[in-house]
UniProtKB/Swiss-Prot annotation:
Gene, per the UniProt record: atpC
SUPFAM superfamilies: Epsilon subunit of F1F0-ATP synthase C-terminal domain, Epsilon subunit of F1F0-ATP synthase N-terminal domain
Any GO CC annotation of this UniProt entry: proton-transporting ATP synthase complex
Record HAMAP family: ATP_synth_epsil_bac
Protein name: ATP synthase epsilon chain
Species of the source: Shewanella baltica (strain OS185)
Gene3D superfamilies per record: ATP synthase delta/epsilon subunit, C-terminal domain, F0F1 ATP synthase delta/epsilon subunit, N-terminal
Primary location recorded for the protein, binned into one broad class: membrane
Length: 142
């Protein structure tokens, strides 16, 4: 019996990153973790910066970093529209660590006109990239 799948498109502002049939998609929506599979109810949600994990039709997994965006689930198609999408293997761990350090330093030395919300967004993006890198390292170690 063939696995039940759904068509998934992951698109950034620059290009289509992934298009194909998947058994499942896991992302962090505005209300928490979302697991999308064949037969999921229609849904529209904001996506928080973080990891998107897909299980392809053949059972293999692929992991992406999403900087945020929108998830649309329809009966036969799932679309992820993200500002920035990076394959996990393309994330520069040192650059993410440096971005985290910079955001923390800005927050520690904040003045009266400091934009705390913008700093929190930058910190969240850096932390999300580092979580994706750690997930990949754990999967490789298995």
């Amino acid at each position: 019996m063939a696995a039940m799948t759904v068509h998934l498109d992951i698109v950034s502002a620059e290009s289509k990153i992934f298009s194909g049939r998947v058994a499942s998609l896991q992302v962090t929506g505005s209300e928490g973790e979302l697991g999308i599979m064949h037969g999921h109810a229609p849904l529209l949600s904001y996506i928080k910066p973080g990891m998107a994990r897909i299980v392809k039709q053949d059972g293999s997994e692929e992991v992406f970093y999403l900087s945020g965006g929108i998830l649309e689930v329809q009966p036969s198609t799932v679309s992820v529209l993200a500002d920035v999408v990076m394959r996990a293997k393309d994330i520069d761990e040192q650059a993410a660590l440096e971005a985290k350090r910079r955001a923390e330093a800005h927050m520690a030395n904040a003045g009266a006109d400091f934009n705390y919300d913008a700093a929190m967004v930058e910190l969240a993006k850096a932390m999300a990239q580092l979580r994706v890198v750690e997930t990949i390292k754990k999967n490789i170690a298995r």
